[in-house]
Each structure stands twice: as C-alpha cells, then as structure tokens.
C-alpha cells in the first residue's frame, strides 16, 4: 500500500481542495470523483461485486472486509475532522508516514448527495491478532520515540501528536511481538 497522499489521484484532489471551506470542498470532491471514476457505492454494486462483508466499525467509519484480497474498506464519516476532507487527507498522509506497513490507500468517495460524500480507504487486514493491552501500546510507542501525554491514548515525539491510540485501535500478534496501530489521529505539533 502506498502513501495515499503521494498517489496521483489523492494528490490531485488535495490540490483542488486547498483554500476551500469544508462546505465548498464537497461539490469539488464529488465532481473530481465522477471525472476520475472514483465513486464508490459501499451499499450497492461496488460492494456486491467484491462480495464485501460488513466488518467491525467505529465512531468515525463503517468498515467492510474483502475476503478475496484481505483488504478492509473504511468509509470515513469525517466526524473527527469537522467535515473537512482536506484535513482528513492530510492526517492520512501523516498516519501513512508513521505506519507504512498498515497504510491507508484512498479509493474514492461514497456519494450521498450533491453536497455530501464520505471518503473511502482500504487498509490491509491483519489476521491472528487481538487488541493490544495498554502496557503493550505504551512499550511500543516508547520504542518509536513517543512519550505519553496528559490524556489517555495521546502520544507525542515533539514533532507528531497521536491521539486515540487505545486498545480498540491497536492490534497485537498473539505473542505480543508485532503491534499494528490500525487507527489513530495524527497531527503535527
């Protein structure tokens, strides 16, 4: 999986969204998705053709798994970025820089109306894992140069600030030696 922001489609979209308000972003993103064949119907033909199965979802995304490719499709509702598509794409770029082995890849948009669409990403499915313990997360983040901050699940290395790094978003191999941060909010300090 490549860095979503370095892929030509995501980068061209980001260039179009710079300087637009979150409300102005939606019609531009939807037009871009239509012109670039990146409209993804997560409840219709797209999902049915791929035999996607509804999978564990969280507050900010609905998830499906593709059993043939071992990819998780994540439809993000933009809740954690205040409806700002560009802000989400920038966060994904930072996340992918920190966690390239479990990177998100931008696929397109699930369009609900002319003024509303949710970005869709894929991420490798990690099998034979369990939720990491708080202790495992702390040890892993410290090994990466991050220090815990005042709030639970928040870490910083002085350059990046990660939040929501909690057991619900971090997986560990059965022996605890491999850690996968499958969901985290990343920003620059």
Regions found by a protein language model. Name each.
Residues 50-54, 60-62, 107-112, 151-159, ...:
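Catalytic micro-motifs at enzyme active sites that drive phosphoryl/nucleotidyl and oxygen chemistry
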Residues 1-51:
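Juxta-kinase regulatory segment immediately upstream of eukaryotic protein kinase catalytic domains
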Residues 65-66, 122-125, 172:
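Conserved hydrophobic "DFG−1" position in protein kinase catalytic cores
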Residues 71, 119-121, 161, 180:
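Protein kinase-like catalytic core scaffold
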Residues 48-100:
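ATP-binding glycine-rich loop module of kinase domains
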Residues 77, 96-151:
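Conserved structural core of kinase catalytic domains
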Residues 58, 66-67, 112, 173-175:
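Acidic surface patches and DE-rich sequence motifs
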Residues 77-78, 154-189:
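Catalytic activation segment of kinase domains across protein kinase-like and atypical kinase folds
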């Amino acid at each position: 999986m490549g860095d979503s922001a370095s892929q030509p489609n995501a980068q061209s979209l980001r260039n179009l969204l710079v300087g637009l308000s979150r409300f102005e972003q939606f019609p531009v993103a939807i037009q871009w998705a239509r012109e670039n064949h990146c409209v993804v119907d997560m409840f219709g033909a797209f999902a049915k053709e791929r035999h996607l199965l509804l999978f564990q979802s969280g507050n900010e995304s609905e998830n499906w798994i593709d059993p043939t490719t071992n990819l998780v499709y994540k439809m993000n509702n933009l809740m954690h970025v205040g409806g700002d598509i560009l802000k989400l794409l920038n966060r994904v770029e930072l996340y992918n820089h920190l966690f390239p082995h479990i990177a998100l890849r931008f696929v397109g948009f699930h369009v609900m109306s002319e003024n509303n669409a949710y970005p869709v990403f894929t991420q490798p499915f990690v099998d034979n894992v369990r939720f990491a313990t708080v202790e495992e997360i702390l040890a892993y983040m410290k090994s990466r140069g991050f220090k815990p901050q005042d709030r639970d699940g928040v870490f910083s290395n002085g350059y990046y600030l990660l939040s929501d790094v909690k057991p619900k978003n971090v997986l560990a191999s059965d022996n605890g030696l491999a850690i996968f941060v499958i969901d985290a909010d990343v920003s620059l300090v």
